[in-house]
């Protein structure tokens, strides 16, 4: 699932503060190690990390001393770092709650921040649709079955977007 995450981070978010959601502690440590090898300030944290290590990672990201925090099932909710400009989904999930909460870590407004970039290496968008997609919420539950998500992925820039004849990110025209 890690794939070309370093290359994509360099291309789309170089130097921006980012949080990576990983599959396990070992995976988070591996991804953080790869980022460090590429010259970035990165750490891995998890529920097994000491409270002081988690607090230091949070402060480091807030203050800009860290560029990437790789976490294993830790920062899904309750973390407020408005400066986060990149979310990396490096684990698949059938949970809409996880998906929206993970992306929500980067949706806070901050001075100078113009947008959030989501590097979805796990294909969560194809399971759940775009995070800003209208959803029907109900306390009655819903029927189980395959959910159709209206998403198209540009072959030129890999942007995932609502179906359209032209990619809104790079202008690629899809064949008719």
Tell me what each language-model feature is.
Residues 63, 79, 96-101, 105-176:
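C-terminal helicase lobe
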Residues 46-48, 91, 122:
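Residues at the C-termini of beta-strands that transition into short coil/loop
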Residues 1-34, 142-149:
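Conserved interdomain hinge at the start of the Helicase C-terminal
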């Amino acid at each position: 699932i890690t794939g070309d995450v370093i290359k994509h981070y360099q291309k789309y978010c170089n130097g921006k503060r980012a949080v990576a959601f990983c599959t396990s502690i070992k995976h988070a440590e591996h991804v953080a190690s790869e980022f460090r090898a590429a010259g970035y300030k990165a750490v891995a944290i998890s529920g097994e990390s000491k409270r002081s290590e988690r607090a230091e990672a949070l402060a480091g990201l807030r203050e800009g001393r860290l560029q990437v925090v790789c976490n294993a099932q830790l920062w899904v909710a309750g973390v407020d770092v408005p400066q986060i400009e990149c979310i990396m989904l490096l684990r698949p999930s059938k949970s809409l709650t996880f998906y929206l909460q993970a992306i929500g870590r980067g949706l806070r407004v901050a001075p100078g921040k113009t947008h959030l970039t989501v590097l979805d290496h796990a294909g969560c968008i194809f399971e759940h649709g775009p995070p800003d997609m209208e959803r029907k919420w109900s306390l009655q539950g819903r029927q189980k079955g395959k959910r159709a998500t209206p998403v198209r992925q540009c072959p030129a820039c890999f942007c995932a977007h609502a179906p359209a004849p032209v990619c809104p990110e790079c202008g690629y025209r899809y064949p008719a």
